[in-house]
């Protein structure tokens, strides 16, 4: 039916033109923003899920930065301990050199000058090693937590004091009376024993029977061969001395037996790397035990830090894997599929051009009614 008042064809064409235009605008918006979901009306459920995933990725990004910071702290600490270990190894070499009987007193004094310089350097490393203005080894660091999860997951790193004067950098020193250089073990002084508490608080004892006729050097060698609690050595003044770094009980060691009575071994005295004096044979021999204890302490802490580094490294790898998976999931939900959206936009443009041409024709349709009047 031809109608002058109602152009149905034009109205239908206009509606399709509007739909094509809306589709074209939506496609351009999706392509320009890079997102398939730009508002809740586009996909309410998808928007909620993608926002949840976005929050998770943001948390993982922060966790990764924290984990890298934690690894950097541990790496800095391990480097400082490596330097400390090298210094202690050099001190031990000097101790072995100074304990050699072929050296004169002046030689040992020269060695002691290097010892003093190394002591200062060891303290300098402990005092000046810092990360982000935090000192790592002067005893102030304590234990710090690093948040390495998307939520509130954390890992702690504890760094110890590495100054030369702390008890862990040495042990207890016991010194007996000076004896005659011709002293020998007799049946009257061959019994030797000592009692102590181990690190678990359990009472322990060692009982030794010395060989009659042995001199003081041979006694020290025999004592060292029979147990590992104390290191025995002889000073230049013919004094038997003992050093132990394995005991932390405040009571120390109780010496017993007629040999101990003759030695009149005094109470224990704390000796650390800060107290090293290699200008004498006895001091050099004592220094070897002290440095060995310090090396054990440093290496133990290096092992802890190495384990921490491995743990953080594994965490970083895991976080990267999770972050990649979550980002891919978020992208599939929210990001624009450019191939598909480009096709939709071209289709809507073609429809828009076609409906525009058809609308022009539809608008001419009422004029055909004039032909009926002529």
Curated annotation (Swiss-Prot):
GO molecular-function annotation terms? structural molecule activity
Q: Which GO terms describe its cellular component?
A: bacterial-type flagellum; extracellular region
Which Gene3D superfamilies has this protein been placed in?
A: 3.30.70.2120, f41 fragment of flagellin, N-terminal domain (1.20.1330.10), Flagellar export chaperone, C-terminal domain (6.10.10.10)
For this UniProt record, give its keywords in alphabetical order, as a comma-separated list: Bacterial flagellum, Coiled coil, Secreted
Q: What else is known?
A: V.parahaemolyticus possesses two flagellar systems: a single polar flagellum propels the bacterium in liquid (swimming), while multiple lateral (peritrichous) flagella move the bacterium over surfaces (swarming). The polar flagellum is synthesized constitutively but lateral flagella are produced only under conditions in which the polar flagellum is not functional.
NCBIfam families, sorted: PRK08869.1-1, PRK08869.1-3
- What is its biological role? Flagellin is the subunit protein which polymerizes to form the filaments of bacterial flagella.
Family assignment?
Answer: Belongs to the bacterial flagellin family.
Name of the protein in its database record? Polar flagellin E
> What phylogenetic lineage does the species belong to?
Bacteria, Pseudomonadati, Pseudomonadota, Gammaproteobacteria, Vibrionales
Q: Which gene encodes it?
A: flaE
């Amino acid at each position: 039916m031809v109608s002058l008042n109602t152009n149905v064809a034009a109205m239908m064409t206009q509606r399709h033109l509007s739909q094509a235009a809306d589709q074209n605008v939506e496609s351009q918006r999706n392509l320009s923003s890079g997102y398939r979901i730009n508002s809740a009306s586009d996909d309410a459920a998808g928007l909620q899920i993608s926002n949840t995933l976005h929050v998770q990725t943001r948390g993982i990004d922060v966790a990764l930065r924290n984990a890298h910071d934690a690894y950097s702290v541990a790496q800095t600490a391990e480097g400082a301990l490596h330097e400390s270990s090298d210094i202690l190894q050099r001190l031990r070499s000097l101790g072995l050199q100074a304990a050699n009987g072929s050296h004169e007193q002046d030689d040992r004094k020269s060695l002691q000058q290097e010892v003093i310089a190394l002591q200062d350097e060891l303290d300098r490393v402990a005092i000046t090693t810092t990360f982000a203005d935090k000192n790592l080894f002067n005893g102030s660091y304590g234990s710090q937590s690093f948040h390495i999860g998307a939520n509130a997951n954390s890992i702690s790193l504890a760094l110890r004091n590495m100054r030369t004067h702390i008890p862990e950098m040495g042990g207890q020193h016991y010194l007996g009376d000076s004896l005659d250089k011709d002293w020998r073990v007799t049946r009257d002084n061959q019994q030797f024993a000592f009692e102590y508490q181990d690190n678990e608080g359990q009472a322990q004892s060692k009982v030794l029977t010395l060989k009659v006729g042995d001199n003081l050097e041979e006694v020290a060698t025999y004592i060292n061969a029979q147990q590992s609690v104390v290191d025995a050595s002889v000073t230049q003044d013919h004094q038997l001395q003992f050093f132990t770094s394995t005991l932390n009980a405040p009571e120390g060691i109780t010496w017993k037996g007629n040999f101990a009575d003759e030695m009149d071994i005094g109470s224990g005295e704390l000796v650390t790397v800060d107290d090293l004096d290699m200008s004498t044979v006895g001091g050099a021999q004592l220094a070897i035990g002290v440095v060995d204890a310090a090396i054990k302490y440093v290496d133990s802490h290096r092992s802890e830090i190495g384990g921490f580094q491995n743990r953080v490294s594994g965490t970083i790898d895991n976080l990267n894997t999770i972050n990649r998976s979550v980002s891919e999931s978020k992208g599939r939900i929210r990001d624009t599929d450019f191939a598909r959206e480009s096709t939709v936009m071209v289709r809507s443009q073609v429809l828009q051009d076609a409906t525009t041409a058809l609308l022009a024709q539809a608008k001419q349709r009422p004029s055909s009614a004039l032909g009926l009047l002529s």
